[in-house]
């Protein structure tokens, strides 16, 4: 019998026409192997065409896109564009990956974490306004920016968030790193606020191997972002700088991959939605397992980058008695790089034992299954940071997990995954 392949959460998937290789080869053939060039320019135009489109075919937007070396770089430059400086405060969704909040600290500013509401799992507008008013009372000034996050591709309550932001005159940086192609009321996420952030990491909806982009409201903002991304050089015949710049521009080689990927973006989005629909159907009668669905409000149109679910605390999983008995030796979830060794297998805020047992069981079935993001306000690095929460994101972290949804995940894979979940449950 052929050995079963590992089913990963979301793997990079190239176009069948091999266009990624074509454009990369062109970069080498013409010696455009620097962070500028024809591929970068064309990729930006392709992204603009997509970002400015409306699903109902109505009048298009006129946003501009700047390609960068990473989504994290885009968050960093967006905060600079919002005027964030040392000592300022930035309101950011707590239930997110660390790249949403770390750039705040790069600038010497302070993250103020905002909790989630239970339907989208994203920033709660009620808590957002509460945080704005309380920070103004405590510090005498308003926060400098608001950073909502499209968790696993789910649109945030952008209409309510923008109304609050406009009310207090605070710019919005949309972290749509996980939400490439998600829409609200037909409009692409990342095009509502002052800036929008996209990610093309190897596990995202499309990839450039590593990379990201910033959506800007106009050419003036895009030019400023470009200036900061290319070391902020002034117009002299020698190198002079009146501001601190960064080396954040995307490589022309990587942009070639992105150009090819744009030809399959809509196919990828459709596939992820199809996988989500299969999970919803196949898991609907599994007691204690609940797939996270988008709101019934038709304005919400998620890309379902990853399919997330929750596991009731009273569901017993095979091997649960051994959960957290051993210290993890390698990164969980396909993370690259080096992890810092720890002495204990547990922390004061972690997934329930049955969720950890399910992760281990699924790993034995060659299925990648990982916990949802740990809220940033519960991370040791942010100990003591202000937080406005109702506890929803902490509870979701205890019970939530992610399932494979990428382009390589077949219908049979989804059926196998669901059968494995059923097998894991002790009856």
Task: Mark where each language-model region is.
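Helix C-cap/helix->beta junction micro-motif
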Residues: 107, 167-168, 365
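Conserved PLP-anchoring active-site segment centered on the Schiff-base-forming lysine
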Residues: 76-130, 134, 331, 346-347, ...
